[in-house]
């Protein structure tokens, strides 16, 4: 059975020649607000003070003056085969194709890459392991720096994490930015968030909040990201280039590490967001209106076999592919992340299902780090390693605790997973935790 069956609403929109066309079930007319922003209590773009707390994201790049003529907001970086994807935006317009100059000397950036929308030309050639690279987004003059990781086989450890690893954006609320992996050793342990996004963290982070923000408020997100189609594009992940699917799951190699990001909401047995095939019983070929919920989604990849068996899903096989026979020698450090569902009321039921789906595979692959979940109070589920032992959950899933369990990457540096804390009370999302 294909994940593009007629009952599936909204499959991955970044389709390629190898991916089937999206199929939409239009039997039941949409009756929601004119602007489908994911909040039926407050259906306005600017917010009417009801419903979800509005999310806030100040510019990642602070303007040099109070009245800037131009400013580029660097939002995210992700590495893809033979290049890098850099997402940045400006409210003033560039007047030319987006471009990046890069090199070792900030005063002489000889290399140049240009592109449109989600791609840049290959700018990976000529880079050497361990060398600090400088880059500048054209039209605003901001210099940034990063250090390349060590090449495979080199024994010296990484002294700094060279990039942020933004993972897939959650489905159930399009404003979710995903998780970010950042260095947290020494003084940077308290200032790491300023390296990426100035957001309203709790008082533990030594960063002054922007005017009008309150602790634990979260981020404010641009209006254009308040629907499914929009969120597929501003936060594009390299699914097609790496054998994955859109923003939902992908993998890549960088330096000594192999990264895998998968979808923690759909595309495995007993996932918290049911796919439509699970409501089709007996002689039915499509779900009835009573069986169709706004939280149903997927599957987004192919399913060869029963939807109740995780190994039937394409996503499981992508994770399995990372455990090839040559992988331990090629990439001795494996890092895998899975964001959980945005709203999950039955926390431990979700843990059980995701462990049943992936635990055996991940342990057999001997991953150095497996991160499962956010720092948000609903699902602090960082485990070392992912295991059915209840001891690993102690202290990491307390609703009253703000601390997170650090993950160690020997001989590299200590890492934390950081995300804004959410406060959600919404009746339409209670079906996430329904019993299978």
From Swiss-Prot:
Keywords: Glycoprotein, Hydrolase, Signal. Glycans are attached at residues 227, 283, 304. The keyword Cell membrane does not apply. GO terms for molecular function: acid phosphatase activity; metal ion binding. InterPro entries: Acid_Pase_Asper, Metallo-depent_PP-like, Purple_acid_Pase-like_N. Residues 1-20 form the signal peptide. Its EC number is 3.1.3.2. It catalyses: a phosphate monoester + H2O = an alcohol + phosphate. It comes from the Eukaryota. Monomer. This is Phosphate-repressible acid phosphatase. It comes from Aspergillus niger. The gene is pacA.
